[in-house]
């Protein structure tokens, strides 16, 4: 590895003629967009929506239809309504697109185009940012940029969030995190970019707090830079803190009713998160301001420690309950029958129990990238050291979080793509001179790790003895709005359906539902589970108490857990074809994917 820090070799690479990233990037974007859009082309973009996408569309429709900006209740969920933990940030561009297009192509056409255009635009933004980060970290090596984009379009865990129909918020969070990494990596050169980075951090958290640990790692890296470099970066760090504090303090009253800021809202942007974000930004401003007047390492360490103690003390004194898991308030019944089986919230330990063959695809590439990035950090130019520390800290936070919740692996794969490409360019400049860098990336891409894990499934099954296979369980499930389309024939009513059917029914019909896959919907989810587990007399009473009009199950993928737990419960009886006298079976669905009963009064 004698060419570890061959700056002359890297300079030659910048001037070497070859593939132009500006030409290849649109080609790769279009290829990826078409590839991940094939299911939508075959089945329709509305059927490509996940449950979260469907619920986001419902929320946007309600807002366009006149629901208040500050009112995030879903009045057709667990009537008379349940609170959602999403903000209006993502609703704004979606509603703007729909309202812009509606006069020209009608509501359905406007929604269809929006479902296609929005994720495609975000994918384009993500690829541009990935290329820019790779350029920044590799000192401008063109092949590193191309390699990073190739890795990104092969980032299997992330691509699902950019398919047509993906409008929930995960794709926007990934894009904002990439932009934050890019801007913060240039913090030593520009106070303006530093301030913009602080704004993007607040905006990401205003959308949702899934990226909070990664953003905290970035803020910690910025604070560490100030401690390390002192006066030479105090202006830029102060600008980052100002952007962070000012934007969060402006976003809070713009998105939330002021009285809600005093409430311990721990699963979304609210008082607790505002305290951490604004307090952290102000702390950075204070540290930078003191350092500009009296710059010593000891004083910087002291002010940093004091700021952390004050901020931590304020948080624990006001919102100590937020230290618990955001799912701590979920009823144990709901946790057992639903939350523990949600794929995107699975921990690494659960994945090893249920689908061990998928672990490599979700975790292999980011973990490998950590090793290469650490080696690149050791051999990099001292002037570039901060950007490598920043990348490693961000990636480490994402990997750690993905061990707890699998869905964060998508962001980890996207952030790892430019870091891995730049690592190879730094470690082996001669490798980056031709196509070998791209070929190596293809061999070590997230998709390759996923393929390796799936191909080794028989051996992995022998070692881990998985309890179930999620893919097999989901193969015949009712997961699209067309599966519930037959319910539009029925008069508007209150529907007791399985959890994953809830958002689909809300999106495609005027009915109200009790259950949906959201942790705040405790009451409705518990009611549905108790009904399905109840013996016939108790089930009759629950239906009467809740004034239910229809009962719906997915007949092609019955809830086997409910059947096993309560073989004489309503779910088991309906699954066996029995119809209690208080229900009337309706023959609505020609595909027979769902079964519907009307409740007799």
Region spans (language model):
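Active-site lumenal/periplasmic loops and adjacent helix-entry segments of GT-C-fold
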Residues: 38-138, 142-176, 204, 209
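Extracytoplasmic
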Residues: 3-8, 445-601
């Amino acid at each position: 590895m004698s060419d570890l820090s061959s700056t002359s070799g890297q300079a030659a690479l910048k001037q070497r003629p070859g593939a132009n990233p500006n030409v290849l990037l649109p080609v790769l974007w279009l290829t990826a967009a078409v590839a991940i859009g094939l299911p939508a082309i075959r089945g329709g973009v509305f059927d490509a929506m996940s449950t979260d996408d469907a619920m986001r569309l419902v929320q946007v429709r309600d807002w366009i239809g006149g629901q208040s900006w500050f009112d995030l209740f879903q009045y057709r969920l667990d009537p008379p309504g349940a609170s959602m933990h999403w903000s209006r940030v993502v609703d704004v561009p979606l509603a703007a697109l729909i309202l812009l297009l509606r006069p020209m192509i009608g509501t359905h056409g406007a929604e269809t185009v929006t479902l296609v255009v929005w994720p495609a635009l975000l994918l384009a933004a993500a690829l541009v940012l990935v290329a820019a980060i790779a350029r920044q970290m590799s000192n401008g090596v063109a092949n590193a940029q191309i390699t990073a984009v190739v890795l990104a379009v092969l980032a299997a865990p992330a691509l699902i969030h950019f398919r047509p129909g993906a409008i929930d918020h995960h794709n926007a969070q990934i894009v904002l995190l990439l932009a934050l990494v890019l801007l913060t990596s240039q913090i030593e050169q520009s106070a303006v970019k530093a301030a913009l980075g602080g704004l993007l951090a607040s905006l990401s958290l205003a959308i949702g707090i899934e990226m909070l640990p990664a953003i905290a790692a970035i803020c910690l890296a910025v604070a560490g830079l100030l401690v390390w470099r002192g006066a030479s970066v105090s202006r830029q760090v102060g600008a980052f803190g100002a952007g962070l504090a000012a934007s969060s303090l402006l976003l809070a009253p713009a998105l939330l009713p002021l009285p809600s800021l005093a409430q311990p809202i721990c699963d979304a942007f609210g008082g607790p998160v505002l305290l951490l974000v604004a307090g952290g930004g102000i702390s950075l401003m204070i540290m930078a301001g003191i350092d500009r007047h009296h710059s010593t390492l000891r004083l910087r360490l002291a002010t940093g420690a004091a700021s952390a103690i004050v901020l931590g003390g304020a948080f624990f004194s006001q919102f100590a309950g937020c230290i618990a898991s955001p799912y701590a308030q979920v009823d144990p019944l709901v946790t057992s029958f639903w939350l523990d089986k949600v794929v995107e919230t699975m921990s690494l330990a659960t994945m090893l129990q249920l689908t061990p063959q998928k672990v490599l695809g979700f975790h292999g590439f980011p973990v490998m990238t950590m090793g290469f990035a650490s080696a690149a950090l050791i051999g990099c130019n001292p002037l570039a050291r901060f950007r490598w520390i920043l990348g490693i800290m961000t990636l480490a936070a994402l990997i750690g979080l993905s061990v707890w919740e699998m869905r964060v692996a998508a962001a980890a794969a996207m952030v790892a793509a430019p870091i891995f490409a730049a690592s190879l360019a730094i470690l082996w400049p001669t490798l980056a001179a031709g196509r070998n860098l791209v070929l190596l990336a293809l061999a070590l891409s997230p998709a390759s790790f996923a393929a390796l894990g799936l191909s080794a499934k028989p051996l992995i099954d022998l070692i881990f003895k998985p309890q179930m296979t999620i893919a097999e369980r989901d193969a015949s499930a009712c997961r699209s709005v067309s599966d519930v389309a037959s319910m539009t024939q029925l008069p508007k009513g209150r529907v007791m359906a399985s959890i994953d059917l809830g958002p689909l029914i809300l999106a495609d019909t005027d009915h109200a539902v009790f259950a949906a896959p959201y942790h705040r919907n405790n009451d409705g989810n518990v009611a549905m589970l108790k009904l399905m587990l109840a013996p016939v007399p108790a089930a009759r009473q629950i239906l009467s108490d809740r004034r239910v009009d229809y009962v719906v199950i997915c007949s092609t993928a019955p809830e086997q857990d409910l059947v096993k737990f309560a073989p004489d419960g309503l779910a088991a009886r309906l699954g066996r074809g029995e119809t209690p006298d208080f229900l009337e079976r309706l023959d609505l669905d020609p595909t027979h994917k769902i079964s519907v009963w009307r409740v007799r009064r």
